[in-house]
Amino acid sequence: MQDENLTTAQRIAEAITERIVSGALPPDAPLRQDHVAREFGSSHVPVREAFRQLEALYLVVAAPRRGVRVAPLDAKSTKEIVEMRVALEVIALRNAAPRYTPTHLAAIELALIEADNAETISEFETANRAFHRALVTPCAMPRLLASLDGLRLANSRLVLAMARNAGWRPRTNQDHRLILQALRERQIGHACDLLTRHNQTIERLARPGGA
């Protein structure tokens, strides 16, 4: 029964994650255990576990008397997401890059190409997350990688929200190419600097006027 609850919780968490990231569930939207349990035909136990998973991914917040709600996307939240991701992804990259094999570099390049070939913002953002995950996976630091998975999903919410407001068109990501080039040349410090600058872009774009 415990394994069944965990499987159901994962299914619920994945479905709600997609709704939050896509914007179908807007910031501060309430999530009620009884409603979610009824929708998925489950007890409250896997719903509570799903909510814990979503909170660990920075997608929902739980507060006394307010219950569980979709995490906000205000300036303060954006700054927090960006600063955490900037710091943690560089730590992961510094530990991952010395372990790269040709297979790792090929995976990074494949994600880059898929992002370049994306025809929709959803396709682009899926490939973008794959690129950033491929950069750091060899670091072999599971807790750090789990935190970064959540931060990338939170970042995707920002990207998709901005795309809905400002529109999106296919483009080549020059930052990604420069990062990959530096890594191929074993210029790890330079790659980390490029990654920091690249990850900070989202906060600048989220400011009024994109300044």
Feature map (PLM): residue ranges:
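Hydrophobic, amphipathic alpha-helical faces that serve as interaction scaffolds
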Residues: 84-100, 129-166, 201-205
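Amphipathic alpha-helical repeat elements characteristic of tetratricopeptide repeat
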Residues: 10, 14, 86, 102, ...
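Short linear motifs at protein or domain termini
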Residues: 1-98, 207-211
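Hydrophobic side-chain positions on well-ordered alpha-helices
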Residues: 19, 115-118, 136, 182, ...
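Hydrophobic packing residues in well-ordered alpha-helices of helical domains and bundles
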Residues: 81, 105-108, 124, 128, ...
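Alpha-helix C-terminal capping/termination sites
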Residues: 98, 120, 184-185
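C-terminal all-alpha effector/ligand-binding and dimerization domain
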Residues: 112-113, 153, 160-211
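Amphipathic alpha-helical segments enriched in hydrophobic/aromatic residues interleaved with Lys/Arg
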Residues: 105-119
